[in-house]
């Protein structure tokens, strides 16, 4: 498919399982040294961005009680950049999607604090005006994760239903019960325990959720979202990464904020000049 050699070549059954179920766990992707290095970098950036927020979980909004969310860390922390642009991960994403090239759509830290509530079941891709572009998330844990401390559950085959009704996971309005959608055919979520060094992948249309964190420690997870390089903007509604690059409806993705990460470049990409809010979903507010 490409003249570049994948740093990590996936087995055919791994790819087949992903395309059948819409999610797959891949073991032993990152070694202990890499994990320690990247976890320290992400921890430091999350701490820097949230240093002024001293609220307890109970004092936060319903959405914020699900997790501390810090997005596009690669843009503001050079030590996180090698993880967000990791050629091994990007190559795996391309193989799973069956495309020659992928861009970095976003990264984010999702740190579910002790006592943090469950994350409501939803699809990712319906949040963004990109239609049905091939899109995949890498869910990278820095700690062992079970249903006790914030594991993910995925509805097998739900990606084949395509875009369903968008779920308001901010809970500013009543969240749609997507698990009862008839297009899911009654399929139930499957909980996935995961150890550090493994990565769980899910399609942009896979319905997924996370359990509450009943442990005494913060559940630390970093995600990287990849999108096919030739994807286009389909609708005009506000979307931070597309608005920042002034991408019009019908135009292909471009710009320093969405760099091509597979095939890899010799050097890590330079971050954009304008970056988003320090925490939360980063919609249209920008700061220099």
PLM segments and residue spans:
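Non-heme Fe(II)/2-oxoglutarate
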Residues: 52, 199, 205-288
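Short, structured patches in soluble enzyme cores that scaffold and shape functional sites
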Residues: 106-108, 123, 140-144, 156, ...
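Short, conserved beta-strand element in jelly-roll/cupin
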Residues: 129-147, 193-194, 201, 225-229
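Double-stranded beta-helix
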Residues: 145-209, 231
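Active-site region of the double-stranded beta-helix
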Residues: 99-100, 125, 130, 140-151, ...
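Glycine-rich phosphate/pyrophosphate-binding beta-alpha loops
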Residues: 126, 135, 209-213
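Generic beta-strand structural signal
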Residues: 100-107, 117-119, 134-140, 150, ...
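Non-heme Fe(II)-dependent double-stranded beta-helix
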Residues: 1-21, 26-121, 127-129, 167, ...
């Amino acid at each position: 498919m490409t003249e570049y050699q994948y740093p990590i070549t996936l087995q055919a059954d791994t790819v087949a399982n992903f395309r059948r179920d819409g999610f797959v766990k891949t073991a032993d992707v990152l070694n202990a040294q890499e994990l320690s290095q990247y976890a320290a970098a992400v921890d430091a950036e999350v701490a820097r961005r949230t240093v002024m927020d001293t609220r307890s979980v109970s004092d936060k909004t319903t959405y914020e009680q699900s997790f501390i969310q810090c997005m596009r860390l690669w843009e503001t922390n050079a030590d996180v950049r090698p993880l967000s642009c990791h050629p091994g991960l990007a190559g795996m994403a391309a193989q799973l999607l069956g495309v020659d090239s992928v861009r970095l759509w976003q990264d984010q830290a999702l740190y579910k604090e002790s006592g943090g509530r469950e994350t409501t079941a939803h699809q990712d891709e319906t949040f963004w005006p990109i239609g049905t572009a091939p899109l995949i998330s890498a869910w990278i844990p820095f700690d062992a994760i079970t249903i006790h401390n914030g594991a993910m559950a995925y509805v097998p085959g739900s990606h084949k239903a395509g875009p369903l009704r968008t779920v308001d996971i901010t809970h500013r309005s009543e969240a749609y019960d997507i698990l009862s959608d008839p297009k899911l055919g009654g399929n139930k979520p499957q909980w996935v325990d995961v150890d550090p060094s493994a990565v769980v992948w899910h399609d942009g249309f896979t319905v997924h959720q996370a359990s509450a964190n009943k442990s005494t420690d913060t559940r630390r997870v970093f995600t990287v979202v990849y999108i096919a390089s030739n994807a286009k903007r389909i609708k005009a509604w506000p979307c931070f990464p597309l608005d920042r690059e002034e991408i019009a409806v019908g135009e292909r993705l471009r710009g320093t904020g969405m760099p091509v990460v597979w095939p890899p470049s010799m050097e890590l990409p330079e971050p954009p000049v304008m970056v988003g809010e320090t925490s939360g979903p980063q919609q249209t507010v920008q700061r220099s």
